């Protein structure tokens, strides 16, 4: 170790490097606390190791590589192994201790409706049951240790992890949770902790290295150089054992990528990029084979030994995994049936008169016994009571063997010492100021940086899936070709005018229906977004604005393709000016449609239900657009739906663009009788009828007299109150309106907290 660090002590190297990566904590005004001398330290922290690795990389020469001489980077790597395996007790002179006492959480469950029970119900009966998920859970987790919460399905494992991770509303959870004796503020906990969900929520077409780098750009501050961020990512890849998979895409059902165990380690790396003090994990080994599960827990052990508190729920750990765990909590229906070291399990169950047989997995035996008791008459109540007595009996011995508990520093002192040691990854440094205290920012980066990173990640992920845009473009082109061939070169007859109305109605509704693909796209990102915003990786407003901006280029391509395919083939009027208005109306329709569907995808979390709702609502929009029934004939109680129809405004805009020329005629003389029984008579008869009508009307009506202009058609459709440009701007405004609603949906619906 001394050979790697040279003559400088670890603390001196850290304090002397103003570029040392630490998390976004600003040291300000607190009295410096006395720390043990550097000579008492037998381990380097992760940040120190990171600095050494980077220095070694900078010093490595081409000649040493050519001659096969061991390079400084190899020495740094060996230092990493020593650091990773260092005993937890040597890591920190100011340890962190997370304590929780009497945690109780219950939910109200509505009884199923029973008509017979309703008839018999007395006045005191209630239709609501209360289910206790946590019942007086207490415990303590220390820096450098791993605590595992075990139990059968429904025992309360995930609920306890959520409670400790501040994912349950405070007014619903009773009890206390403290770090070094102080209640954690929500804003501080988001900065110094991380939560790894059970599902691996990753962008499929990003590589492992890119995934972690984007996480670094989100969680590490702008003040930290790109070089330092890359160094942190490279060191984390080595720590997670992902070097061989660094350039491999994550993958999904349609794209081959990393293995399940590697995917899980990437998920963990995503959330620990900022080197958190506390790490919560919900069943990190779920769905993995025994080898992959062991590797994941081994990685978590390294993270704990770097100076973190690791708390996880785990279903049924193997014998090898048990050897890595420091503290266990067994739960049964929300009650603690055992808490303590794995080494005390045999003694505990032996005193409970259920000794663990020799050569049997201790956790499997405990879980099987708990399961048997749950189905017995008394349930697990005897075991719960015995555990309370056993803990009370063990308390004096436990306290004597753990006198270090009394030496826990205050939270402020511990965090300040952690910054001094380089534990937290931030742009702040420990200078020689006489007063230092950590000050936490809500977000690591400014708004515009977040927007750039979100957009860059989304574009990179989409660029590697060209089939998504290709399918949308193909659908739009096929629809455009079908319409162009069905409505080729429409004439200016009454039938031609009617066919134009049909073309516009179908064209406008098509633009909205093709936007339905946004539902699975956002739902794929929904839980990634929830995970990242839960710990303030970026602002929700940054996500909404960035996603809105990067969606526009695709909409421009789709709009141009559809407009170019149909406008001249159908024979629409207006020349170049008419074409550009038609194009911008199509673009505005795509914008409004994608915004509307994006908003609904934020409200409805199910793909199939989302498609059903979107298709139904768009059908209603088309029904009330004015094509099937004019505004004047819509019942007054449905008129409001006409005005909120997204199809109404682009439909009326393109109709005005087509029929605004007052000199353009769509019915002359004898064409007046088309679409009526008189239309079957010879032209001579029709001419005589026109002469007779002229005498009655007092106006000469000949076979060439224009009887219906474009303006007349607009009046027949009831399109007289809004200009075509206003229709365009209203359509654009609808798009912005639904984006704002989408933002509030994310703001309200992504709190990641149980009620």
UniProtKB/Swiss-Prot annotation:
SMART domains: AAA. InterPro entries: AAA+_ATPase, ABC2_TM, ABC_transporter-like_ATP-bd, ABC_transporter-like_CS, ABCG_dom, ABCG_transporters, P-loop_NTPase, Pigment_permease/Abcg. The keyword Translocase does not apply. The chain crosses the membrane at residues 468-488, 503-523, 552-572, 579-599, 609-629, 728-748. Residues 449-659 form the ABC transmembrane type-2 domain. PROSITE patterns: ABC_TRANSPORTER_1 (PS00211), ABC_TRANSPORTER_2 (PS50893). One of its GO terms (molecular function) is ABC-type transporter activity. GO terms for cellular component: membrane. GO terms for biological process: suberin biosynthetic process. Keywords: ATP-binding, Membrane, Nucleotide-binding, Transmembrane, Transmembrane helix, Transport. It is a multi-pass membrane protein. It comes from the Eukaryota. ATP binds at residues 151-158. It is found in: Membrane. Residues 98-358 form the ABC transporter domain. PANTHER family: ABC TRANSPORTER G FAMILY MEMBER 2 (PTHR48041:SF115), ABC TRANSPORTER G FAMILY MEMBER 28 (PTHR48041). Belongs to the ABC transporter superfamily. ABCG family. Eye pigment precursor importer (TC 3.A.1.204) subfamily. This is ABC transporter G family member 2. The gene is ABCG2.
């Amino acid at each position: 170790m001394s050979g790697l660090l040279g003559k400088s002590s670890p603390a001196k190297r850290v304090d002397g490097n103003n570029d040392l990566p630490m998390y976004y904590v600003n040291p300000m005004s607190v009295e410096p606390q006395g720390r043990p001398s550097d000579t008492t330290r037998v381990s380097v922290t992760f940040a120190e190791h990171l600095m050494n690795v980077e220095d070694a990389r900078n010093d490595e020469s081409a000649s040493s590589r050519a001659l096969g001489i061991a390079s400084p980077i190899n020495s740094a790597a060996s230092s990493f192994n020593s650091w990773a395996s260092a005993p937890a007790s040597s890591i920190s002179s100011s340890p962190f201790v997370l304590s929780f006492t009497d945690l109780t959480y219950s939910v109200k469950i509505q009884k199923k409706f029973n008509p017979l029970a309703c008839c018999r119900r007395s006045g005191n009966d209630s239709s609501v049951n209360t289910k206790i998920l946590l019942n007086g859970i207490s415990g303590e987790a220390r820096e450098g240790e791993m605590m595992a919460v075990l139990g059968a399905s429904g025992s309360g494992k995930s609920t306890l992890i959520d409670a400790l991770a501040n994912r349950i509303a405070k007014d619903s959870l009773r009890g206390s949770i403290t770090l070094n004796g102080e209640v954690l503020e929500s804003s501080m906990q988001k900065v110094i902790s991380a939560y790894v969900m059970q599902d691996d929520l990753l962008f499929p077409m990003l590589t492992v290295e890119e995934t972690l780098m984007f996480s670094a750009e989100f969680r590490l501050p702008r003040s930290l150089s790109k070089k330092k961020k890359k160094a942190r990512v490279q060191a984390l890849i080595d720590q997670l054992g992902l070097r061989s998979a660094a350039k491999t895409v994550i993958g999904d059902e349609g794209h081959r990528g990393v293995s399940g165990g590697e995917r899980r380690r990437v998920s963990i790396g995503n959330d620990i990029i900022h080197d958190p003090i506390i790490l919560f994990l919900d069943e990190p080994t779920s769905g993995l084979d025994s080898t992959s599960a062991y590797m994941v827990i081994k990685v978590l052990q390294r993270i704990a030994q770097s100076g973190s508190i690791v708390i996880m729920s785990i279903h049924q750990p193997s014998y090898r995994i048990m050897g890595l765990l420091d503290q266990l909590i067994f739960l049964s229906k929300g009650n603690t049936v055992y808490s303590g070291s794995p080494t005390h399990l045999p003694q505990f169950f032996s005193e409970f008169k259920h000794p663990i047989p020799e050569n049997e997995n201790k956790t499997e035996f405990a879980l099987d016994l708990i399961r048997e008791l749950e189905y017995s008459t008394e349930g697990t109540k005897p075991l719960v009571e015995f555990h309370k007595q056993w803990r009370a009996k063990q308390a004096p011995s436990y306290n004597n063997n753990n006198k270090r508990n009394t030496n826990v520093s205050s939270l402020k002192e511990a965090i300040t010492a952690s910054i001094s040691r380089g534990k937290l990854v931030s742009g702040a440094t420990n200078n020689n100021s006489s007063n230092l205290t950590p000050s936490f920012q809500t977000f690591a980066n400014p708004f515009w940086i977040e927007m750039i990173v979100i957009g860059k990640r989304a574009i990179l992920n989409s660029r590697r899936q060209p089939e998504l845009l290709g399918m949308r473009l193909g659908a739009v082109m096929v629809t455009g070709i079908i319409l162009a061939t069905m409505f080729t070169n429409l004439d200016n007859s009454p039938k031609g005018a009617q066919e134009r109305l049909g073309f516009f109605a179908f064209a406008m509704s098509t633009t909205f229906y093709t936007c339905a693909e946004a539902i699975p796209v956002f739902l794929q990102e929904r839980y990634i977004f929830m995970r990242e915003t839960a710990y303030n990786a970026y602002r929700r407003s940054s996500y909404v604005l960035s996603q809105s901006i990067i969606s526009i280029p695709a909409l421009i391509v789709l709009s141009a393709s559809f407009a170019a395919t149909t406008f001249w083939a159908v024979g629409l009027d207006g020349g170049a000016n008419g074409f550009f208005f038609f194009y911008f109306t199509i673009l505005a329709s795509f914008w409004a449609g994608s915004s509307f569907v994006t908003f609904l995808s934020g409200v409805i979390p199910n793909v199939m239900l989302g498609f059903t709702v979107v298709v139904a609502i768009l059908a209603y929009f088309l029904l009330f657009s004015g094509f099937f029934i004019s505004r004047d004939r819509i019942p007054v109680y449905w008129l409001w739906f006409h005005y909120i129809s997204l199809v109404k405004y682009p439909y009326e805009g393109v109709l005005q663009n087509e029929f605004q020329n007052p000199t353009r005629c769509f019915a002359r003389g004898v064409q007046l009788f088309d679409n009526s029984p008189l239309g079957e008579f010879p032209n001579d008869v029709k001419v005589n009828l026109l002469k007779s009508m002229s005498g009655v009307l007092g106006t000469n009506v000949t076979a060439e007299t224009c009887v219906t202009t474009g303006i007349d058609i607009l009046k027949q459709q009831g399109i007289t109150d809004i200009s075509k440009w206003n229709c365009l701007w209203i359509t654009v405004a609808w798009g912005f309106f639904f984006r704002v609603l989408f933002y509030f949906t994310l703001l309200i619906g992504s709190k990641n907290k149980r009620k």
